[in-house]
Amino acid sequence: MQVEWSKGAERNLDSIEAYIAQDNPAAAAKTVVKIVKRTFAQLSKHPASGKPGRINGTRELIFPEIPYIVIYSVPGETIFILRVFHTARDFENLPEQGVTVFPLC
């Protein structure tokens, strides 16, 4: 299956990298690469492996060794990554809480 990242998810990855880079630039790049690689590896083979999402029509992928949640949807043959955020964030009060499954922005 094909995996596509929304602009919102790409912005999330940029923000994650910028935040971590304040203290450790090398770790910042490694973290983002790990999120992207693990997400692709898991979802391209097992698109339903995430748990049902808190937003209707989504699923959530959580990796124990990476403290980030990947919100995605699978409306057909393409997996759409909608958002990525740290598990310590308050999901209900995220500034980008308005995740819409369609259309992707």
Predicted segment positions?
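Basic/aromatic recognition patch in beta-strand/loop cores that engages polyanionic ligands
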Residues: 36-37, 45-79
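Solvent-exposed interaction patches of small proteins and small membrane subunits
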Residues: 23-24, 28-31, 51-58, 83, ...
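Enriched for short, Lys/Arg-rich terminal
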Residues: 68-69, 73-105
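Arg/Lys-rich, positively charged N-terminal/basic patches that mediate binding to nucleic acids
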Residues: 1-33
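A general structural signal marking secondary-structure boundaries and capping sites
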Residues: 20, 24, 43-47, 88
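Short amphipathic alpha-helical/adjacent loop interface patches that line ligand
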Residues: 13, 17, 36-40, 65
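Outer-membrane beta-barrel domain signature
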Residues: 7, 31, 37-45
